[in-house]
């Protein structure tokens, strides 16, 4: 969930139901300077933990194409609002697919930038070594416009970098296509679209080469080790003392226990 000054920022959780953003996230400041008008916040899975936008204290988000289907998640509200035509663009956060998957489900464009190219200052963290803010729009061109405004080094984010692509100046580059990502489970339609892009890049003079990362098959298992561990550390701050709601109790331990029991989940 991304801070916008003066907006409630509940993270789709009872825990932060009354919490109001005290400042703008860096990406929000950048877009405001560019003239962007923010119209509201969207729904997501609680604290970005989910892939369907059904796990929210405020109810599920429906897919604009068919309300019987989910919009994906965790940034399902961000994808749905663009798909429905209620906004030209939105922002989401992507840890393990939370921008790209709902964008796919809703028929729009979602982009997870390279880690560090977009400041995470003002993002409520899920898994800090994986989280990245990115745009959701209707077209690749719109995605490029939003990304160009939010990318760049930010001293407020210790993981921020100066993106190397700013130095390319349309030079011919070498691009790798991962063999492991084009195997069983990928639809013919998806493979055909990737092949179209590969051919386009070759026509532009770029060196497009098939490459292999044999450990790719272990990626999901590793993700489920890293993400829950970092999530546990990040959610520990919501204890009824510093942030969020507070349940009354006779001891601090009991207070934290009651607060977290009421604040998290259903």
Language model feature labels by segment:
Residues 1-13, 170-178, 229-266:
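Short helix-loop capping/hinge segments that flank enzyme active sites or metal/cofactor-binding pockets
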Residues 1-95, 195-199, 203-205:
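Gly/Ser-rich catalytic/binding loops embedded in alpha/beta enzyme cores
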Residues 2, 44-45, 95-99, 103-105, ...:
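Acidic, glycine-rich active-site loops and adjacent beta-strand->loop/helix elements
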Residues 7-9, 49-53, 100-105, 122-123, ...:
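Short acidic, glycine/serine/threonine-rich loops at helix termini
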Residues 55, 59, 221-234:
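Charged, often glycine-rich, active-site loop that binds/positions anionic groups
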Residues 95-121:
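Glycine/threonine-rich beta-strand-loop-alpha-helix active-site module
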Residues 112-192, 250-258:
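A short helix-breaking turn/cap at a secondary-structure junction
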Residues 186-213, 244-250:
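Acyltransferase
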């Amino acid at each position: 969930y991304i801070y916008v000054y003066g907006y409630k920022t509940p993270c789709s959780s009872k825990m932060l139901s009354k919490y109001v953003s005290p400042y703008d996230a860096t990406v929000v400041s950048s877009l405001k300077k560019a003239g962007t008008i923010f119209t509201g916040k969207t729904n997501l899975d609680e604290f970005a933990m989910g892939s369907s936008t059904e796990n929210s204290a405020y109810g599920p988000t429906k897919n604009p194409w068919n309300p019987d289907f989910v919009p994906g998640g965790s940034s399902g509200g961000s994808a749905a609002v663009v798909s429905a035509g209620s906004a030209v663009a939105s922002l989401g956060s992507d840890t393990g697919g939370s921008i790209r998957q709902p964008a796919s489900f809703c028929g729009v464009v979602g982009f997870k930038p390279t880690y560090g190219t977009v400041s995470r200052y003002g993002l409520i963290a899920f898994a800090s070594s994986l989280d990245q803010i990115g745009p959701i729009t209707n077209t690749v061109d719109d995605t490029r416009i939003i990304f160009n405004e939010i990318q760049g080094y930010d001293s407020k984010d210790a993981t921020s970098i100066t993106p190397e692509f700013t130095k390319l100046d349309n030079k011919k580059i070498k691009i790798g296509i991962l063999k492991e990502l084009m195997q069983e489970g990928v639809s013919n339609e998806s493979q055909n679209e990737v092949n179209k892009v590969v051919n386009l890049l070759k026509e532009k003079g770029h060196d497009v080469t098939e490459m292999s990362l044999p450990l790719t098959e272990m990626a999901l298992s590793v993700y489920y080790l890293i993400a829950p561990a970092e999530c546990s550390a990040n959610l520990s701050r919501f204890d009824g003392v510093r942030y969020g709601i507070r349940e009354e109790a006779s001891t601090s331990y009991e207070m934290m226990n009651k607060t977290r029991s009421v604040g998290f989940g259903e």
